[in-house]
Amino acid sequence: MRVLCAFPEAMPSSNSRPPACLAPGALYLALLLHLSLSSQAGDRRPLPVDRAAGLKEKTLILLDVSTKNPVRTVNENFLSLQLDPSIIHDGWLDFLSSKRLVTLARGLSPAFLRFGGKRTDFLQFQNLRNPAKSRGGPGPDYYLKNYEDDIVRSDVALDKQKGCKIAQHPDVMLELQREKAAQMHLVLLKEQFSNTYSNLILTARSLDKLYNFADCSGLHLIFALNALRRNPNNSWNSSSALSLLKYSASKKYNISWELGNEPNNYRTMHGRAVNGSQLGKDYIQLKSLLQPIRIYSRASLYGPNIGRPRKNVIALLDGFMKVAGSTVDAVTWQHCYIDGRVVKVMDFLKTRLLDTLSDQIRKIQKVVNTYTPGKKIWLEGVVTTSAGGTNNLSDSYAAGFLWLNTLGMLANQGIDVVIRHSFFDHGYNHLVDQNFNPLPDYWLSLLYKRLIGPKVLAVHVAGLQRKPRPGRVIRDKLRIYAHCTNHHNHNYVRGSITLFIINLHRSRKKIKLAGTLRDKLVHQYLLQPYGQEGLKSKSVQLNGQPLVMVDDGTLPELKPRPLRAGRTLVIPPVTMGFYVVKNVNALACRYR
């Protein structure tokens, strides 16, 4: 629940509405404020704070959570992942068998893995019996790919739980691949800026590798089929898709399906527009292809994966929902926050930017609920910055403020699943870099997965608030969300609550737990940048300890810092953290 708190920043806005602040029982909370003043000094360690902000620190924020009933319940796979088809182009698909990559992906399971992106509609499936012959003879790619195949055959480690194919790739081989990927990155960027894309061939062998990665990692694969293959009458040409469906069914691959990616852009990408009504008919056609295939007769189908809901996009969604609203299991759209070519580090701290998503959610919900009230809605392919992201920004600690706020806002407004673009690929919006090292948003996602359950709780705060002048709105720089603690986390009994807090202020903030949370033990998971780069750092520390993998097969233990019962929470400036309130015995959290 997004909340207003002490001395937020006033910013001009002509179109924004004031964010809601829930504070029932204000008299009760005011009494608690009076009784709790003696505990303000719970943490006396000096922190670097501007002298001008000294008065702000005297404000104590009282926080309570409604524990009787959840306000929302989202999907168990709420935080999910995406892989872009560009990994075929740059060669990284052949390295999905990496033990380190599989370990990192397993850390974020259970989740969906969407295989889709801008190159979805240029993807063609070929069931080649001998892929080596299709490579055109010896060359750098030939030797690199066959070297990888040899390693997989000779050095496969069979996972004891699944019997997965997992490989240890030699350093020299990874270095060759990085050089190739760096060259291809320039090609991919050129395609993206010119909006002209070359065709991609997905072989049966490549599909095997993709599915092996998803299955070994505990991820459910969602495959986005090419929707731009069109017949002369503009109906969908399903021949390539049918070949892929038959092959995957023969392998008994458990896959869900989509058709296309951002159909609102087809005119500029392909010179041929597809309206919402036609796209709806195409989805019905895809459903008719799936039903006779025994393993896919009840497979889930998602779409239409539209872009930002501008007027023309809303019109496309409206036409789609009229025809195929009941055909899809969830309605999907995409969101990008910033133009990656002009982004600055301070952009990630702007409350106006954090709030742009809320209006889009309402627009999508309005159309969906008109035709299929209660239909699940997913945000697919969310990225912080466009154009592949910006080095040292999109992959830095600073980008985490947008990502964590996105997770909190979406769950609070009833979006069922959010799919992060991307787990691993070219560019800088990913969770894992090309050295297979987890970036700050990965660690943030890992903490979220470990601590946050699907039940969303209402947050109530009390504290001094400044009234906005006419024509202006106060935007909150302290954001607090609450969920039931993940019931799969055996370190905490059912009934515990997890708060996650974003402090965008340049001063620390003090929060006193009240009501049902009062005098409970708290475990702190404070995530801060590590190193001299500050907000631009690509490394993070948890409660003062840097987070790094133990080895290729082992993630580090996420150790909390216990806080004594009744202690005031002190949130350092420009940081984010998770706080597990133990043994609350919250009724909303006792049962699944």
UniProtKB/Swiss-Prot annotation:
Taxonomic superkingdom: Eukaryota
Annotated Gene Ontology cellular component terms: extracellular matrix; extracellular space; plasma membrane
Tissue: Widely expressed, with the highest expression in brain, mammary gland, prostate, small intestine, testis and uterus. In the central nervous system, expressed in the spinal cord, caudate nucleus, thalamus, substantia nigra, medulla oblongata, putamen and pons. In the urinary bladder, expressed in longitudinal and circular layers of detrusor muscle. Found both in normal and cancer tissues.
Signal peptide segment: 1-41
Glycosylation sites: 254, 392
SUPFAM superfamilies, alphabetized: (Trans)glycosidases
Function (record text): Binds heparin and heparan sulfate with high affinity, but lacks heparanase activity. Inhibits HPSE, possibly by competing for its substrates (in vitro).
Quaternary assembly: Interacts with HPSE. Interacts with SDC1 (via glycan chains).
Gene Ontology MF annotations: heparan sulfate proteoglycan binding; heparanase activity
Protein name per Swiss-Prot or TrEMBL: Inactive heparanase-2
Gene responsible for this protein: HPSE2
Principal location class: secreted
GO terms, biological process: cell population proliferation; extracellular matrix organization; positive regulation of cell population proliferation
Subcellular location: Secreted, Extracellular space, Extracellular matrix
Family listed: Belongs to the glycosyl hydrolase 79 family.
Disease: Urofacial syndrome 1: A rare autosomal recessive disorder characterized by facial grimacing when attempting to smile and failure of the urinary bladder to void completely despite a lack of anatomical bladder outflow obstruction or overt neurological damage. Affected individuals often have reflux of infected urine from the bladder to the upper renal tract, with a risk of kidney damage and renal failure.
UniProt keyword terms in alphabetical order: Extracellular matrix, Glycoprotein, Secreted, Signal
PANTHER family assigned: HEPARANASE (PTHR46145), INACTIVE HEPARANASE-2 (PTHR46145:SF1)
